[in-house]
């Protein structure tokens, strides 16, 4: 192996196979853009985002790690969310859960 070299398997890599997903319509009712990262607990996003918040509890965006979705002021779009895996405990973010989901 050469330092810094990547050894990637050929073919496509499927993300979050077998996990529950939902699609929600999300609108930015604020006057500034809002960006949400791939692993941010969607339930705890900025209050200027309007959507079925209760349905998003325990879920994150179903996008590749280290990417994000940006919502411009007045913009509305559908996003796909996926269940958190593992122990399903959430700490930090906006502090709305701080424990088991």
Curated annotation (Swiss-Prot):
Class of this enzyme: hydrolase
Keywords: Cytoplasm, Hydrolase
Alphabetized NCBIfam families for the sequence: PRK13203.1, urease_beta
Top-level division of the source organism's lineage: Bacteria
Reactions catalysed, as given in the entry: urea + 2 H2O + H(+) = hydrogencarbonate + 2 NH4(+)
Encoding gene, per UniProt annotation: ureB
Family note: Belongs to the urease beta subunit family.
Protein name: Urease subunit beta
Keyword Cytoplasm (UniProt): yes
GO cellular component terms given for this protein: urease complex
Assembly with partners or alone: Heterotrimer of UreA (gamma), UreB (beta) and UreC (alpha) subunits. Three heterotrimers associate to form the active enzyme.
Transmembrane segments: none
GO molecular function: urease activity
Keyword Transmembrane: no
Xref: SUPFAM superfamilies: Urease, beta-subunit (SSF51278)
InterPro entries reported for this sequence: Urease_beta-like, Urease_betasu_sf, Urease_subunit
Annotated organism of origin: Pseudomonas fluorescens (strain Pf0-1)
